[in-house]
């Protein structure tokens, strides 16, 4: 027999302990959850969504999706509660207004339009049917034709050195207006000089009086251009100064939007030849037709096609069927429109959760364990799970106090964001080509990250439900009386920061922050552990009952032992008696057979003797 190795039992116990520890770590308390809707259920809702979408035309995929969400919202779950959720980077686009932010524009022909190259932007396009709402005048442009609520773009606008598409009196009746203008842009020099070179030296400066265009002569919206104006007879008086656009009294001045309009059509520029005639400007040549390309960076996009825009109750309804969603344009057909849209950094949406709201899984687990231990029916699995939850509580107590989990998660979000932005914008490969292009790409990334940092900053200030990692379910309950679904719907369709029509995001954010800043119940680790241990040990029997249990168990063991040891003897005795009885029966049977045979022989002998005595 082989000898047992030293430490064999110790190693076996260690393996068993590790196995038990692994099993306990995998144990969880599962609550009954409602199943997700099946594909047939969603398909059954589609006809209702289609009917709802027809109530308020036009019918677009976005409108049908919102109607489907509306129908799903009406399907109430008795055990569910609605909370406001913060959803970053939603997969939707919204119309951009004139009073929100400056739109950066990059071009491929910097010798014609100056500025920064679009080499770091990869042109993309896809078909789309778009429907959106906005309370601001939309950034819509129509090429060589008037269109309701769009700004007409004309061809062949003359500058001292170039001829490009842009804004002139065909946009609307021109007048002059006084105002403050963009304070961060200097005034233009009175002494304008014209020099001919390879590149066009555009100089950004403003005039003291703006050119004001009455858009479509409707006397409702006015386009202001703060660049120095000129006359058709003397275009050089205008100077090589790019337009500076603003609408009405909006404090945002678009300094690069003119390059996007220049890409609607063709252009040409002057170039220097040897001065033979001795004229003022020398011998100047004119290039052939040039077709520049203009691009906007993420998160801005362009929708090109035939747009329908209507104004109802101070709300602009934008509809475009079978249009093109793109980030670059190079030529626009006469009569087509182009609008500028943007992906919002976030949206606020009410969502329903079936479980209770909590921001730390370990604390919620401990609470459920304490509740389960206090119930009449308890089990060993709950006791073991309670020990595991206590260990988890110790490991995450600091996390609950300083929100370390949220900080780490935000770091992963920023890292993933940086990777995705670099990948989508295509800057990783093209960023090293030119210093200027590298700075342009870096500027775009920084601007996008700036918006994301603002979103993350708000995300870091609030606590979120622990079960949802890609959205933030806040503590703020959703109240249909304060925020009807119609306002939520308009918020998703593009109306922001309008208390009367859509969600008042500032008020909603302040209410959420008030909840976060309110005094919170501190976690007393000692009291929590004492309470947990009391509930835990209350499941074990007392000493008196344990003694009775041990006595009864001993008696039961003795009875079992007696039965185990006596039963074989009894069985063996019964078997022996049975075998002895059987032997005796066989012996008696055998003896009876012998007696019967002996008697038969006597009878035969007697018969033989009687037969011999007869004469």
UniProtKB/Swiss-Prot annotation:
Residues 590-593 are annotated as: Required for cell transformation. GO terms for cellular component: membrane; viral envelope; virion membrane. Residues 1-84 form the signal peptide. Glycans are attached at residues 108, 127, 178, 219, 275, 319. It comes from the Viruses. GO terms for molecular function: enzyme binding; structural molecule activity. The chain crosses the membrane at residues 379-402. Residues 403-615 are cytoplasmic. Residues 411-461, 495-531 form a coiled coil. Keywords: Cleavage on pair of basic residues, Coiled coil, Fusion of virus membrane with host cell membrane, Fusion of virus membrane with host membrane, Glycoprotein, Host-virus interaction, Membrane, Oncogene, Signal, Transmembrane, Transmembrane helix, Viral attachment to host cell, Viral attachment to host entry receptor, Viral envelope protein, Viral penetration into host cytoplasm, Virion, Virus entry into host cell. GO terms for biological process: entry receptor-mediated virion attachment to host cell; fusion of virus membrane with host plasma membrane; symbiont entry into host cell; viral process. Residues 85-378 are extracellular. Interacts with sheep HYAL2 receptor. The envelope proteins induce cell transformation leading to ovine pulmonary adenocarcinoma (OPA), a contagious lung cancer of sheep and goat. They bind to the HYAL2 receptor for cell entry. Env proteins probably do not act as oncogenes by themselves, but may rather liberate an oncogenic factor that would normally be negatively regulated. PANTHER family: ENDOGENOUS RETROVIRUS GROUP K MEMBER 113 ENV POLYPROTEIN-RELATED, ENDOGENOUS RETROVIRUS GROUP K MEMBER 21 ENV POLYPROTEIN-LIKE. Both SU and TM seem to be involved in efficient transformation. The cytoplasmic tail of TM is necessary for the transformation. This is Envelope glycoprotein. The gene is env.
């Amino acid at each position: 027999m082989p000898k047992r190795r030293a430490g064999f039992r110790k190693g076996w116990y260690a393996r068993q302990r590790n196995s038990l520890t692994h099993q306990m770590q995998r144990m969880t308390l599962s609550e009954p959850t409602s199943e997700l809707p099946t594909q047939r259920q969603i398909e059954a809702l589609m006809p209702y969504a289609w009917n709802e979408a027809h109530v308020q035309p036009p019918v677009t995929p976005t409108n049908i999706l919102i109607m489907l969400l509306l129908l799903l919202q009406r399907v109430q779950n008795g055990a569910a509660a609605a909370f406001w959720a913060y959803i970053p980077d939603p997969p939707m686009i919204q119309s951009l207004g004139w009073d929100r932010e400056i739109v950066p524009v990059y071009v491929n022909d910097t010798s014609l339009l100056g500025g920064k190259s679009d080499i770091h932007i990869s042109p993309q396009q896809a078909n789309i049917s778009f429907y959106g709402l906005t309370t601001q005048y939309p950034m819509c442009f129509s090429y060589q034709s008037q269109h309701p609520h769009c700004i007409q773009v004309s061809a062949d606008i003359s500058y001292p050195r170039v001829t490009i598409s842009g804004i002139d009196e065909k946009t609307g009746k021109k007048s002059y207006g006084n105002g403050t203008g963009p304070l961060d842009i200097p005034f233009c020099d009175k002494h304008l000089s014209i020099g001919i070179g390879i590149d066009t030296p555009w100089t950004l400066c403003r005039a003291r009086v703006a050119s004001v265009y009455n858009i479509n002569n409707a006397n409702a919206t006015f386009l202001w251009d703060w660049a120095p104006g000129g006359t058709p007879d003397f275009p050089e008086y205008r100077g090589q100064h790019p337009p500076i656009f603003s609408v009405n009294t909006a404090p945002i001045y678009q300094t690069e939007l003119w390059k996007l309009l220049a890409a609607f059509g063709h252009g040409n520029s002057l170039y220097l030849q040897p001065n033979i005639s001795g004229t003022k400007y020398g011998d100047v040549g004119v290039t052939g037709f040039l077709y520049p390309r203009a691009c906007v960076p993420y998160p801005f996009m362009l929708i090109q096609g035939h747009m329908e825009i209507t104004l109802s109750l101070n709300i602009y309804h934008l509809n475009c069927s079978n249009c093109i969603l793109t980030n670059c344009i190079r030529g626009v057909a006469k009569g087509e429109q182009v609008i500028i849209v943007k992906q919002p950094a976030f949206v606020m949406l009410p969502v329903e959760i079936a479980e209770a709201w909590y921001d730390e899984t370990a604390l919620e687990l401990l609470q459920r364990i304490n509740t389960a231990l206090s119930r009449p029916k308890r089990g060993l699995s709950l006791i073991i799970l309670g020990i595991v939850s206590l260990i988890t509580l110790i490991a995450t107590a600091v996390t609950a106090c300083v929100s370390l989990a949220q900080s780490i998660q935000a770091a992963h979000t920023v890292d993933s964001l940086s990777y995705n932005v670099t990948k989508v914008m295509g800057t990783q490969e093209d960023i090293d080509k030119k210093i200027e292009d590298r700075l342009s790409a870096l500027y775009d990334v920084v601007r996008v990250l700036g918006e994301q940092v603002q979103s993350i900053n708000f995300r870091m200030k609030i606590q979120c439900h622990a079960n949802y990692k890609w959205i933030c379910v806040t503590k703020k309950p959703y109240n249909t009386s304060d925020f009807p679904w119609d306002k939520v719907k308009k918020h998703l369709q593009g109306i922001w920061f309008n208390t009367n029509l859509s969600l008042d995001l500032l008020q909603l954010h302040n209410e959420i922050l008030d909840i976060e800043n309110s005094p919170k119940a501190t976690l007393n680790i000692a009291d929590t552990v004492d309470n947990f241990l009391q509930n835990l040990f209350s499941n074990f029997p007392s000493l008196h009952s344990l003694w009775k249990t041990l006595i009864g168990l001993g008696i039961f063991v003795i009875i079992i032992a007696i039965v185990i040891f006596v039963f074989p003897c009894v069985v063996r005795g019964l078997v022996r008696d049975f075998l002895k009885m059987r032997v005796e029966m066989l012996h008696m049977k055998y003896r009876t057979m012998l007696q019967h045979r002996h008697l038969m022989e006597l009878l035969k002998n007697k018969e033989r003797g009687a037969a011999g005595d007869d004469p």
